[in-house]
Amino acid sequence: MLLLAPQMLSLLLLALPVLASPAYVAPAPGQALQQTGIVGGQEAPRSKWPWQVSLRVRGPYWMHFCGGSLIHPQWVLTAAHCVEPDIKDLAALRVQLREQHLYYQDQLLPVSRIIVHPQFYIIQTGADIALLELEEPVNISSHIHTVTLPPASETFPPGMPCWVTGWGDVDNNVHLPPPYPLKEVEVPVVENHLCNAEYHTGLHTGHSFQIVRDDMLCAGSENHDSCQGDSGGPLVCKVNGT
């Protein structure tokens, strides 16, 4: 992940949206324009993570810039800062469903609508969540299907093993090399008050200032975390066998 205190735990900071889904990643404070990817993981098996999507922006080519999760045949969940305020033209945005290697077999899908949480302003204030409506529903299969969202009452105890996936950097300033495989890494849930204390290390905000808010969830461990390239992507945890 993004390190504010390299000698401490590197913590994956996620916001728990109103939908009660821990399904996207937010960068650390002070790094709002940097996305996050995977460090310390391995290539994901082709049979896993069928809800993973890649968000693409138009340029010299359709460049990957954020991750997301398919939560319905026609809806993708991602981070608000991935699309707000930079994405003004829907024609410049595409969604690529689960693929093992970026760019090799693209079938880019157009987006018809972006819904950003009305309370989102900047990452540090929380509510960093957005929904993308696809122009057409996708065909659900064993290779492509939705992730299960937890109920609002679900809790994620400290130490609970979860997984982060994406196509981001594999280390600080080290880009994912060709053929750009989807990566995965297992990370434990970290208590919010510990996470908040770690994020204050080296800052001058005072400990009364809450960096990790109540609508956020922390997960991560030393050398196993996220890095630049996949903000908005999923954090998934196995609960009751699902």
From Swiss-Prot:
Can you supply one Gene Ontology CC term for this chain's record?
extracellular space
Presence of the UniProt keyword Secreted in the record = yes
The protein's recorded glycosylation sites are N139
A single Gene Ontology biological process assigned to it is: proteolysis
Where is this protein primarily located?
Answer: secreted
Location comes to: Secreted
Q: Which residues form the signal peptide?
A: 1-25
What is the annotated quaternary arrangement, including any partners? Homotetramer.
Its family remark reads:
Belongs to the peptidase S1 family. Tryptase subfamily.
What's in the keyword line of the UniProt record? Disulfide bond, Glycoprotein, Hydrolase, Protease, Secreted, Serine protease, Signal, Zymogen
The record's top EC class is: hydrolase
Reaction catalysis annotation: Preferential cleavage: Arg-|-Xaa, Lys-|-Xaa, but with more restricted specificity than trypsin
**Gene3D superfamilies attached to this UniProt entry:** Trypsin-like serine proteases
Q: Which cysteines are joined by disulfide bonds?
A: C66-C82, C162-C237, C195-C218
Provide the active-site residues from the annotation: H81 (charge relay system), D128 (charge relay system), S231 (charge relay system)
Q: What gene does this protein come from? A: TPSD1
- The name under which this protein is listed is Tryptase delta
